[in-house]
Amino acid sequence: MNVSAVADLSPEARAALFERDAGIEDARESVRDIIGRVREEGDVALRSYAKEFDDVDIGTLAVTDEAERAYDDLDDDLRDAIETAAENIRTFHERQVPDDWREQFDGRELGRRYRPLERVGVYAPGGTAAYPSSVLMGVIPAVVAGVDHVAVATPPAEELPAATLAAAHVAGADAVYQVGGAQAIAALAYGTESVSAVQKVVGPGNRWVTAAKAEVRGDVEIDFLAGPSELLVVCDDTADPELIAADMVAQAEHDPNASVVCVSDDEATAEAVADACERQATARERTEAIESALENDASAVLCARSMSEAVLFAEEYAAEHLSIVAADEEALLDRIDSAGSVFLGGFSPVAVGDYASGTNHVLPTGGLAKVAGGLSVDHFVRSTTVQKLDEDALSSLRETVTTLARAEGLEAHAESVDKRFD
């Protein structure tokens, strides 16, 4: 990787870094066909797609009972790791549960109450690897929120990943289906003979999954449309370049289209990070994906003229993952508002948030962190406002309400208040 100056980036280079999207447009037409077929044919379509896309002949779509058996048969070390991660995730998300409240305001009793959704679907990607962590991240916040029925959909296989099934059991999923891709999103959104329809679908996936979420949005709620993984590192000369590179390579491992960027106000540190990335990318099982991610136009090692310039870059970038490794990291954090999840200091690798620190790894990408946060308990509850007024309280607002209503030409609104004083 070459080091470029932030100030010298061409408009084209800046666009490649900042104009990140989920890359779903070319998938939407085929996804619409899949969704339409699932809505028409139900389980028949799901089995057909399992054979076409996954080369699997599936009988029973629901594999909920297999989850507990997978947990019982799991290797002790992996079981312990899943349970530890689950406990940390649960503890963090329990802190997010909102409390109902009512208060008096000059005779007006106003409040807000929160109620969980009834039915939620969590997509857990599969394909080249099993992702039990995604099951934990999607299911646990829903369970903590009090959702009555949480279903997991994961791609079918001749032998389903035991870790994924076990994670569903540990997290508290009520149903597990061996259905993947856009067809899984369609099944969760609209239901089939075997798959119960839900109110909301959450979880990461490839561009076909993301395109399907975009298509069903409006009929059901979704969390957000997430693209390939992103990491932005802001560091100074106190950072260890080898550790910065290790985090960048780790995120590049996710996807050849991942975006990994480092911005340092120290040129020597930037050069060392670039060199370390190239060295660490080699001789790995996923070297090809890592090297593709490091070499794509959305990845870069940059040198800023000052830490203020680096901070401005970070705020505009609005990364999914933001790592800050600097002498004054807390002060720098105070100056950056837009990021999905922040990792402070040299002992906070992004991987710990991916798995077990307790924060959620389902995060906004493509700059969405400017307006949205990561998956949380908030995604699984709805709020209702409540008001109760006595006669004196309504009387004090009578003129205000009737004047505004008549100014808007809504006489019946005004009369609905006046009649209470006839």
From Swiss-Prot:
Q: Cross-referenced SUPFAM superfamilies, in alphabetical order?
A: ALDH-like (SSF53720)
One biological process GO term for this chain? L-histidine biosynthetic process
Read off the InterPro entries from this record. Ald_DH/histidinol_DH, Histidinol_DH_CS, Histidinol_DH_monofunct, Hstdl_DH
| Listed EC numbers | 1.1.1.23
Catalysis: reaction(s): L-histidinol + 2 NAD(+) + H2O = L-histidine + 2 NADH + 3 H(+)
Residue positions annotated to bind Zn(2+) are: Q251, H254, D354, H413
Q: Kindly list the GO CC terms recorded for this protein.
A: cytoplasm
What name is this protein filed under?
A: Histidinol dehydrogenase
Residues annotated as binding NAD(+): Y123, Q183, N206
Cofactor(s) the protein requires to work: Zn(2+)
**UniProt entry keywords in alphabetical sequence:** Amino-acid biosynthesis, Histidine biosynthesis, Metal-binding, NAD, Oxidoreductase, Zinc
The gene behind this protein is hisD
Homology family: Belongs to the histidinol dehydrogenase family.
Which species does the entry assign this protein to? Natronomonas pharaonis (strain ATCC 35678 / DSM 2160 / CIP 103997 / JCM 8858 / NBRC 14720 / NCIMB 2260 / Gabara)
Which residues are noted in the entry as substrate-binding? S229, Q251, H254, H321, D354, E408, H413
Tell me the Pfam families matching this sequence.
Histidinol_dh
Return the Gene3D superfamilies for the record: 1.20.5.1300, Nitrogenase molybdenum iron protein domain
